[in-house]
């Protein structure tokens, strides 16, 4: 009855009832109305908030029962305050006040939020919600709209090459229910991530004609659960509601609905009705700002826990996340280049581990331990070349499934040496700065650093000094406030080719930051991941994306120091190293190979050179004499023997003619070329000249091919360079080496005992060189530097007791097992490496008279020196090696 009488009362009575309220209650009502208005503007929960019992009699209006629905039930106080300012208690006025913000309408100072900031210009970075300072930082980019049909490795390589130009990155693939296949690109510095995103906004990225979507993943400002920033972007899937948590200062869109990310709830149902004390005004302000951001198209910006990405993304769906913070190498004192890989299958092989991890860096050693059944799973230790490679592999592969189990990765124990690897250097770091900071721990022997590189090698005289420097200098700021050093131990016996600190040339450096080997031929452009080639934005319709020329670290260092004025192609796997060597006084074998390449490069073209036309016009009878193995392609290749060595396999008619024209030994070749004789006359003339050029009883290549049945017989036709034992660990391999090209004096001067001066009979392989293109280029550069009398190339075959030149074969020392050479070749093939021996054995007192020996198994690099044998025998089935001996230049 009391409520009915109040409903029938006059407007004056309603006004007097409202004016009789206490000031404290009016303030509470205005505060609640502002909170509801902000929550509705941000797309928040529309849950009914029950009015206080003592306020019900005062909430009268002329709207009748229509204002007692779900919307009007929680707005009694709001309508009361609105009625005081407007002079009427209409429900429509109450709703209008709710939409426009009641604190201002009631004459009170607004306590919810200032007006939203103006929208940023197109392409600019969005401002942090609720902050007037700089934009929020992010180090991770989310790449979506990826094709589900592309192989994972191929997709990773393409994305890696696109984004690595902006800085040091790590990349992982994942799959989400909402976006499908996605990729996360992590940058070390926020400015690198921002630059990459701005580049993606300016130029549309395509992957096989499919536009990619690039979005930032913001660093988290605080923990908690999330809500939508606008009601218009509600998700289709809603996860189970989580426990209530404090409101986060950022209002943003979460990324994945069904994943176990440490994110806030997708649905407003799970959020409390904004009744947390003291923090509600800030939450409302941030909600308003988030709504304004959504109005200008920023609702797709995401904010996830940054470290949660390292643990969760790319993990198989359904595996629990490991809540573990991944420290950077400069902050983690336990970080080393050795990784422990746990929870492996007992059947896992070294090949599987290398295939999974080698994309992140050079793996020097793999050790797999398989405990007995019932005593735990298998585990392994992987030794990378440096700390950056190990950390990149640890971050990227943690939780990945190898075999049937998700693996666990941690750092192994360090192997202290006197040599340190120092990473994280700035582009302006100098040798003087490195020496000044590191010499306080002890005497420094060498510093290997190229200005502009991000790493250096420092060798101490004592192990204690190296250990002290490694412990104290990790995390030391050098080169700027945003750069801190990453220090770890490196192989003490390896040395880079010196650039400034040491004047004399040293053996080829083994510390190139390479990633990708000859085993994966389609990943040749992925050789150097820490050194970014200046690729343009790739187009996936361009099939040469992975075949483009760029400069590797070894080549860039050579160019910076002006050691040689030449350029090389990183894709070259044979003698394709220099474009204009004729004016440098190189020996004729190099010129011949260069000219042979220029001829062979015309294969498959519609236009043919006169040389090819002459080859096609030869008679059918002559073609039958050559046999089926003498193809036109082989006939166009040239014999690349040295000037003083006449090889019996150069009886190919076209090759003899072309080789004679290059050397200029027979002037009547030009007369025969200009003669008007017919085809038969020219063929007979060439046969006659071939016989004159090679004073051997064999007149037809067919007879010679039948005589030389294998590579050992072919080697007997060459000059013997050395015979003895190659030693690897506890095995020795009797070997005979015959000279393919080069100087005999290099062999006699370097392959001798330094103490007694006698000829060496045993060579021990102590190091390995990975068959990576930058390292092969470095070997070729050293060969070029040693020309014409500073190198030798030999063919190594199995030495037989009855073979020619094996009468001086030494006896096997006790403790060594005699094995066939094919076992050594198989070992090097499996390791994808070449054997390395420092010459002379035992060291040298001075800098003169030193060199290196490289023992290459059959590979693309070694095949360039066996073209003559390949033409003669057709195919090389016998196991062999190509030995390259290079003398160091002063």
Curated annotation (Swiss-Prot):
Renumbered to this chain, the Low complexity biased-composition regions fall at: 10-20, 226-237, 647-657
Record field: compositional bias (Pro residues): 113-124, 238-247
Residue ranges of the motif Nuclear localization signal: 593-597
Composition-biased stretches (Basic and acidic residues): 22-34, 66-78, 573-616, 626-646, 671-703
| A single cellular component GO annotation | nuclear speck
Pfam families in the cross-refs? RRM_1 (PF00076), SPOC (PF07744)
Q: Where is this region: Interaction with Epstein-Barr virus BMLF1?
A: 722-890
Q: Which parts of the sequence belong to the RRM domain?
A: 139-219, 337-414, 418-492
Q: Report the principal subcellular site.
A: nucleus
Please tell me in which tissues this protein is expressed.
Ubiquitously expressed.
Linked residues for Glycyl lysine isopeptide (Lys-Gly) (interchain with G-Cter in SUMO2): 213, 702
**Residue numbers of Phosphothreonine PTMs:** 532
Q: How does it assemble?
A: Component of the WMM complex, a N6-methyltransferase complex composed of a catalytic subcomplex, named MAC, and of an associated subcomplex, named MACOM. The MAC subcomplex is composed of METTL3 and METTL14. The MACOM subcomplex is composed of WTAP, ZC3H13, CBLL1/HAKAI, VIRMA, and, in some cases of RBM15 (RBM15 or RBM15B). May interact with NCOR2. Interacts with NXF1, the interaction is required to promote mRNA export. (Microbial infection) Interacts (via the SPOC domain) with Epstein-Barr virus BMLF1 (via the N-terminus); the interaction is direct.
Supply the name of the protein: Putative RNA-binding protein 15B
Give the source species. Answer: Homo sapiens
């Amino acid at each position: 009855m009391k409520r009915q009488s109040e409903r029938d009362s006059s407007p004056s009575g309603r006004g007097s009832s409202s004016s009789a309220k206490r000031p404290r209650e009016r303030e509470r009502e205005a505060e609640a109305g502002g909170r509801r208005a902000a929550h509705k503007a941000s797309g928040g929960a529309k849950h009914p908030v029950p009015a206080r019992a003592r306020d019900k009699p005062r909430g009268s209006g002329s709207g009748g029962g229509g204002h007692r629905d779900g919307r009007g039930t929680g707005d009694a106080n709001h309508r009361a305050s609105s009625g005081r300012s407007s002079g009427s208690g209409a429900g429509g006025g109450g709703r209008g006040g709710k939409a426009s913000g009641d604190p201002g309408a009631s004459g009170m100072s607004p306590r919810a939020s200032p007006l939203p900031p103006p929208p940023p210009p197109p392409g600019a970075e969005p401002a942090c919600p609720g902050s007037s300072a700089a934009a929020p930082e992010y180090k991770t980019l989310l790449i979506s709209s990826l094709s589900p049909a592309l192989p994972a490795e191929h997709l990773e390589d393409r994305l890696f090459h696109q984004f690595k130009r902006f800085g040091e990155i790590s990349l992982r693939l994942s799959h989400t229910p909402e976006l499908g296949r996605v990729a996360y690109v992590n940058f070390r510095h926020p400015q690198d991530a921002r630059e990459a995103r701005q580049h993606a906004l300016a130029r549309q990225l395509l992957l096989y004609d499919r536009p990619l979507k690039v979005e930032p993943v913001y660093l988290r400002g605080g923990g908690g659960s999330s809500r939508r920033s606008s009601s218009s972007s509600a998700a289709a899937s809603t996860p189970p509601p989580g426990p209530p948590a404090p409101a986060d200062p950022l209002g943003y869109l979460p990324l994945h609905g069904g994943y176990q990310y440490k994110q806030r709830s997708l649905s407003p149902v799970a959020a409390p009705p904004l009744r947390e004390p003291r923090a509600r005004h800030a939450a409302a302000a941030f909600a308003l700002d988030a709504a304004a951001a959504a109005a200008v198209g920023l609702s797709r910006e995401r904010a996830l826990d940054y470290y949660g990405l390292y643990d969760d993304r790319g993990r198989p769906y359904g595996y629990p996340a490991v809540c573990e913070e991944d420290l950077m190498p400069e902050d983690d004192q336990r970080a080393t280049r050795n990784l422990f890989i746990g929870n492996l299958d007992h059947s896992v092989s070294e090949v599987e581990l290398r295939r999974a991890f080698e994309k992140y860096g050079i793996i020097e050693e793999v050790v797999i331990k398989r405990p007995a059944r019932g005593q735990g799973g298998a585990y392994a230790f992987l030794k990378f070349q440096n700390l950056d490679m190990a950390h990149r592999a640890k971050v990227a592969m943690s939780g990945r499934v190898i075999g049937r189990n998700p693996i666990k990765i941690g750092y192994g124990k360090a192997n202290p040496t006197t040599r340190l690897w120092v990473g994280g250097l700035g582009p302006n770091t100098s040798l003087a700065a490195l020496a000044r900071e590191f010499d306080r721990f002890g005497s420094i022997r060498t510093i290997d650093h190229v200005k502009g590189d991000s790493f250096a090698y420092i060798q101490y005289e004592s192990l204690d000094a190296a250990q002290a420097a490694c412990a104290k200098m990790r995390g030391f700021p050098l080169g700027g406030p945003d750069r801190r050093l990453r220090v770890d131990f490196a192989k003490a016996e390896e040395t880079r080719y010196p650039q400034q600190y040491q004047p004399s040339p040293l053996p080829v450096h083994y510390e190139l930051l390479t990633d990708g080997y000859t085993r994966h031929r389609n990943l040749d452009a992925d050789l150097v991941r820490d050194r970014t080639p200046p690729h343009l934005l790739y187009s996936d319709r361009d099939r040469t994306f992975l075949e483009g020329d760029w400069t590797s670290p070894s080549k860039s260092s050579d160019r910076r120091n002006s050691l040689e004025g030449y350029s090389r192609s990183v894709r070259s796997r044979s003698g394709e190293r220099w474009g204009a060597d004729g004016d440098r006084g190189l020996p004729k074998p190099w010129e011949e190979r260069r000219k042979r390449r220029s001829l062979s490069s015309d294969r498959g073209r519609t236009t043919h050179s006169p040389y090819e036309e002459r080859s096609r016009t030869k008679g059918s009878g002559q073609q039958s004499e050559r046999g089926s193995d003498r193809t036109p392609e082989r006939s166009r290749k040239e014999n690349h023997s040295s000037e003083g060595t006449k090889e019996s396999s150069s009886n190919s008619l076209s090759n003899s003619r072309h080789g004679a024209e290059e050397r200029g030994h027979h002037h009547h070749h030009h007369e025969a070329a200009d003669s008007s004789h017919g085809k038969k006359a020219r063929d007979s003339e060439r046969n006659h000249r071939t016989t004159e050029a090679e004073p051997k009883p064999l007149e037809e290549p067919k007879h010679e091919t039948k005589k030389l049945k294998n590579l050992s017989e072919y080697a007997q036709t060459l000059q013997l360079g050395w015979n003895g034992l190659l030693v690897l660990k506890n095995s020795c391999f009797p070997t005979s080496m015959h000279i393919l090209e080069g100087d005999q004096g290099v062999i006699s001067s370097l392959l001798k005992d330094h103490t007694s001066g006698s000829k060496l009979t045993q060579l021990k392989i102590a190091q390995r060189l990975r068959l990576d293109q930058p390292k092969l280029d470095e070997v070729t550069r050293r060969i070029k530097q040693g020309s014409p009398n500073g190198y030798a190339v030999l063919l190594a075959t199995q030495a037989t007791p009855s073979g020619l030149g094996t009468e001086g074969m030494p006896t096997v020392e006790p403790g060594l097992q005699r094995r066939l050479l094919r076992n050594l070749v198989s070992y090097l093939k499996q390791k994808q490496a070449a054997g390395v021996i420092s010459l002379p054995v035992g060291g040298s007192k001075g800098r003169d008279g030193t060199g290196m020996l490289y023992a290459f198994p059959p590979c693309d690099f070694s095949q360039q020196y066996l073209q003559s044998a390949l033409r003669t025998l057709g195919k090389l089935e016998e196991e062999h090696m190509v030995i390259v001996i290079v003398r160091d230049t002063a």
